[in-house]
Structures are given as structure tokens and as C-alpha cells.
């Protein structure tokens, strides 16, 4: 029988390449993950989401797949995977796999046949179009800053790639493609995998006629209208549910980009029979200049963050379900981004956790977030591996003439590699990640910020996360209650109330490095309040309280007294 077990779960995301190496080759692997399962269990997580482990040329580090039914050699064997799955289940945990269905690697056997023969059945598995007198079919740019059309000399046509040149988009209009994808999904679910996170789901339905990029930048057309939420996206999703998910008691989550809450409800509404929940990125785009790329920085306005998160809480309150996250493999470290990774690293990391993880939804904790890992201080482009970062640097510096120092400032703030530096386990060689040479440099602050140090510090970010997760489970019914934002216009405080018929939870958070004054809400019974969680030592409970830099307090109010 299908259940909503995922509503009470806490998910821990692993980027396997950077989590734990077991054989000294500098690359994390499945046996390394097995060796750290007890750590994840002790944290309090219930589900492990593992990024792609399929064979890949690693142009985009696993998101360019050549075989969806195998394990990449550097990660281990299928036997290793079976042992991982068994060990996960023995600990009462669940395993969710990342599944890439918008595109394949150009090294995939389907594409290798398609590029050589226009008459191959695999030709229609991808988007092929003739060029124009000016070159490509359109002048659009991909997510990685290069043209979306790549010329292929064997047949004299262009193929579509919404991401890197080596990631060719699959043609979901072709029912054979869809059935082949469903077969691959069932392959893993039949092994006992507990769910799938679907990568770039919003891109699978595309429009045939693509307007000019020049029209877009001149504000004459919608931004990239052929990319997200095409007209058949929900038809495809209903088919995925009918063909695959409806036959298993598993979790389904899709990455859908920059959708609105109204659009999000179409994906995850309980009456839609599509997905359990979605990853949207509205709240993660608030520190970029409107209409520009995420490299184009601007300060975060707290009022904007409160507004966006509240809209999602309210819109999905009775229909659908939210994902609660700050970090993943594509985002920089949140304590460096929205907090203070210097003097107030611990305080701000804890405050950020209290802000997001007491909301309604399923928490997603990304590896290293729970110990307050920070962005890396790499100032040379040679130290980066991420194709998105490298492409942007070369385009802006060498093609557009940007100041290299300005470009590097953007990279230091936003590169995906900040999330991908090796997990910091201890203060020993390579942070305990590997005995060999790590595939990506370790953040040099590992001597101070690491799991071993955090485990021995009662006041650590790690121990705070453990308490927070425990409280979510202790008050599981309250975590399904209503959400109401308080003080929406306060420039420093992020305050909200969770409530059910018996209890209230008041989360008060100073989102700044300056002191902030909090007035106890008149409609909240202070006499019935007790402090559940805080990131400073305090025991005062007054009508007016001064909150220190990045201070967070979470109160429980009993409505029955």
C-alpha cells in the first residue's frame, strides 16, 4: 500500500564523487558511502539521496550518462551498489537515486548511432534540425553559456543541447524514448530503490519554434520560453506516474527550475497525481540581478526571501508538498551566501537551519551543510573543475573583456564547485576524504571545520542539526500544521508561527550581524512558552528582547493550558 512516509522524512544528499574515497584514487565511491552510513543515521536522517553514479565521461560529473543501467567504474560495481542498498535498509534508512531523463551523453550508444545515420531509429531519439543561412537553427544560448545547437559534420545537421555541448537532449515527443526511459526507471525501483529525484524535469517538453535570443535580451519575448514547463510536461508526468510510480511505494521528486507557486502546485498537487514534491529555485535566485545570470550578484533583501518562502508555504499548505533546502550540488555553501562564514559562522549556520527546517515540508540537508562547511577560497580558474564555471570565465574574460577580478568575485560567490569540495571528516590528510590526490582540492579550512571536531563540541553546528532534526520528529504533528509569517516588513528578523490544534511553534531569527529588537507578539501566550532550541546561551523571556547577531530562538507554546 502506498503511504506518505516521505512527509515525515529528513533527506541527506550525497555527492558521491566528493563524499568518501575508499580505495585511494581521489574519487569518492560506493564503499566509501557504506563506511559512513552510521554517521548519517546518527545525524537523524531517514533518506539518502545520491547524485548520479552511472557511467559517464564526466563532462558534467555524472549528469552526462552513457548507460542508465550500470555503475561507473570509479564508483564501484553493481555488487557494491547492492551492498549499499542492503546496508541502507538494514539501518532503517531509504535510498533515493538521481535520474537524468532530459538528456544523455553524446557518448551514449543511442547518440553514437544517431549522429552517423539519418535513417537510424535513434535519430528521432534526439532533436536534429538543419541550419539556416546564418548558421544554427536559432541563436539561443544554453544553460552553460554556449549555443544550444551543435553542428555535427557526418550528417550536416545540428543537435539540441540545453546544457553542455556533450549533453544531447532527448526527444520526449517520441514514444519509444519515453518507454525506454520508463524501463530504466523500473530497473532501479525493481531493485528496491525507495525513490527517484528527476533531474531537469521541466525541460523535457519543448516548443518547436524558438524565438530569437536577441528578442529576449531586448525584452521582446519571454525568457527562454522553450525551456521550462512546455505544453506537454504534465501529460508526460501523468504518463510517468501511470507507467512507473503508481506501481511502487516510493518517493518522487522533480527538479523544475524557476517555477511560481501556482505552477508548482500543478506538479505536486495531491489531485494532480504527478509528483510528491518538487525542487524550485525562486528563493535561491534572490541574490542575482533580475533578468541576468546567477553570476550577476546583488545583495539579498530579507523581505524578498520572506515573501517567496511564505508564498510557497501558503500555496502548498493544503495541496502539494514543499522541499525545504538551502544547499545542493549546484548551489554554493549557504553559510557563505546568506550567513557569515567568518566570526559568526556557527551562529549563522544554525540560524539558517532554524529558518528553513521548521517550515512545512521535507528537509533536504546537503553533505557538509550540517558542519557549516563554507565556500572555498580558490582564486585561480585552474583550481575549478565545474564546466559551468569554466565556460563562464572564458566567455566573460576572453570574449567579452570583463575584468578578471570581477569575474573571479562572482565565482568565489557562486561556483558549483563550492558544494563539491571533498567532505571534511577530520583534520588529517585531505580532511580524511582520501589517501590519494583528491579530484578537487580540499577547502583549506578543513583543519578547523570537520566532522571529528564537531562531534567533540557540544555547541557545534552538527550537534545543533541533530537537535533540530530530533525536534522535528518529536513534534511531527505540529510540523504538519499551519504556517504564518510575522513581521513581514522587519529588515532584520525572520519570524513565523507553526500551529495545530494543541500547540504553536514560534521561530524567531535575526538574519543580520547587527543586534535586533524583538517584541513578543500580543496574541501569543508568553506564560505558556518554553524555549525549544537556540544558538546562544539564554534564558530570558520578556515582552521585548534583544537578539544578538544571527541569534535564533525557537519557542513551543502549549494552547491547552
From Swiss-Prot:
Keyword Mitochondrion belongs to the record: no
SMART domains membership: Aamy
Record: active site: 199 (nucleophile), 255 (proton donor)
Site (Transition state stabilizer): 330
A biological-process GO annotation: oligosaccharide catabolic process
Catalytic activity from the UniProt record: Hydrolysis of (1->6)-alpha-D-glucosidic linkages in some oligosaccharides produced from starch and glycogen by alpha-amylase, and in isomaltose
Protein family (similarity comment): Belongs to the glycosyl hydrolase 13 family.
The protein's name: Probable oligo-1,6-glucosidase 2
Species of provenance: Bacillus subtilis (strain 168)
Gene name in the database record: ycdG
